[in-house]
Amino acid sequence: KKNKIYKSDLVSTFPNNKKLNLTIYTNENNEKITTIYSENPKPLLSSYKFIKGFEGGILDFYSVQRDDVSESVIKISDFKIQEVPVLAKLLTLASLQGIADLLTGEGIRFDDFELKFTSKDKLMRIDELYAIGPAISIMMEGYIEKNNLISLKGTLVPATTINRTIASIPLLGNILVGK
């Protein structure tokens, strides 16, 4: 209707037999809902210049567009990133898993990634970004102005620091981390 998508379902398979599902529909409040599920997220992430050397993973994407503003969440589980900044590589050396990841050349492993962002016109505001892995965790926020400026601030934390912090909590630390 009026050159707008009101309902679309795409079920597809990559050449490696991994699934890709895309759903777009307009709800009763005239909000456009987009969902993507992919067992092969690399082709979907290749246009993001700040994500390089991505391998593996399963991607879930959910977006609601109201008027000209979209609020979105990307979740990715069980993946590796091969090209990371030098500081992140140094911090991964603080754990045995990080050393193993770097020595194999396969990249730094992450168990979970979540990105919550809002887009309007050419501005993407990153409300929350986190990636948690056995060697390092990353938390960020900021914004990306299309074809112009990227401003991100956040924290890189070696996993050993997180484990020590949790371990120092009486009783709870013994249960979660052990001795």
PLM region spans:
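Surface-exposed, gly/pro-biased binding rims or lids
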Residues: 157-179
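Solvent-exposed beta-strand/coil patches in large extracellular/periplasmic or lumenal scaffold regions
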Residues: 1-157
